[in-house]
C-alpha cells in the first residue's frame, strides 16, 4: 500500500536567515523553542496530541532540521491523521488501513466479517467473472467499493484483518466459478466465452462449503 505525499507546501529552503522569518515560517529544528510553541498553541494546536506528534514525525522524516515549516502547513498535515495519530486514508476517509512494518504480520488473520460483505463480494465476483470471461480486469473492477463498504462496518483496529479475510473469501468464490466453468466445458480457458448457465448452480453457501478462508489459495492462474 504505497503512498506518495508532496510536502512542498510545508517546506522552503532558506539559508542565512533566522530560525523564525518574517512570513511566519520557522526552521523545523526550532519546533520545541518557546517562541514556536507559543505560536502553535495560539493557533489552537495541541502539541501534546497524538495527531500533532504523528504530523511532526512525518514532517521530520520528509525533511531535516534546516528546512522550514509553518502553522498552516502543520494544520494541513495534522488533518491527515485522527486523534490517535493514525493515518486517514484519503480515498475513503477511514483510519486503520495503513500497512506498516509493525502490523504487516498481525493483519494477516481471519476474523468474523458481516455476511452482507461476503454476499456483496460473491455477487460482484460472479458478475465480473462472467463479464470478463474469467479475466481479472483491474481497469473495470469495482472490488475497491466492496472493500470500502466492509471497512466502514468494522472497528478501526479490525479493518486490515477484515480486508485480509474478505480477500480470502474472494479467492474462494473465484475458484468456485472457475471450477464450474471448467465442469461445464472441460476445454474452457480463461478469456474464452463461458458456457451459458455454467455458474447458475454455484451459490455462495456452496462455494464456501468445506472451505477454510485461512487456507484459501488459487489453484489456477486466474
Regions found by a protein language model. Give the residues of each.
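Type III/flagellar secretion export determinants
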Residues: 1-222
Amino acid at each position: 500500500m504505497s503512498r506518495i505525499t508532496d510536502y512542498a507546501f510545508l517546506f522552503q529552503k532558506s539559508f542565512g536567515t533566522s530560525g523564525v522569518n518574517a512570513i511566519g515560517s520557522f526552521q523545523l529544528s526550532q519546533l520545541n523553542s518557546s517562541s514556536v510553541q507559543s505560536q502553535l498553541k495560539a493557533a489552537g494546536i495541541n502539541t501534546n496530541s497524538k495527531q500533532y506528534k504523528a504530523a511532526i514525525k512525518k514532517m521530520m522524516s520528509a525533511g531535516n532540521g534546516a528546512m522550514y515549516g509553518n502553522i498552516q502547513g502543520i494544520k494541513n498535515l495534522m488533518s491527515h491523521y485522527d486523534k490517535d495519530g493514525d493515518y486517514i486514508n484519503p480515498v475513503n476517509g477511514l483510519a486503520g488501513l495503513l500497512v506498516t512494518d509493525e502490523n504487516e504480520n498481525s493483519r494477516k488473520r481471519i476474523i468474523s466479517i458481516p455476511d452482507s460483505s461476503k454476499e456483496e463480494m460473491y455477487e460482484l465476483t460472479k458478475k465480473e467473472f462472467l463479464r470478463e470471461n474469467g479475466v481479472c480486469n483491474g481497469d473495470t473492477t469495482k472490488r475497491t467499493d466492496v472493500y470500502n463498504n466492509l471497512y466502514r462496518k468494522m472497528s478501526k483496529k479490525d479493518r486490515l484483518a477484515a480486508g485480509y479475510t474478505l480477500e480470502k473469501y474472494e479467492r474462494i468464490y473465484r475458484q468456485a466459478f472457475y471450477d464450474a466453468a471448467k465442469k461445464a466445458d472441460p476445454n474452457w480457458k480463461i478469456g474464452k466465452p463461458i458456457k451459458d448457465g455454467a455458474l447458475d448452480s454455484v451459490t455462495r453457501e456452496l462455494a464456501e462449503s468445506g472451505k477454510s478462508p485461512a487456507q484459501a489459495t488459487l489453484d489456477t492462474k486466474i
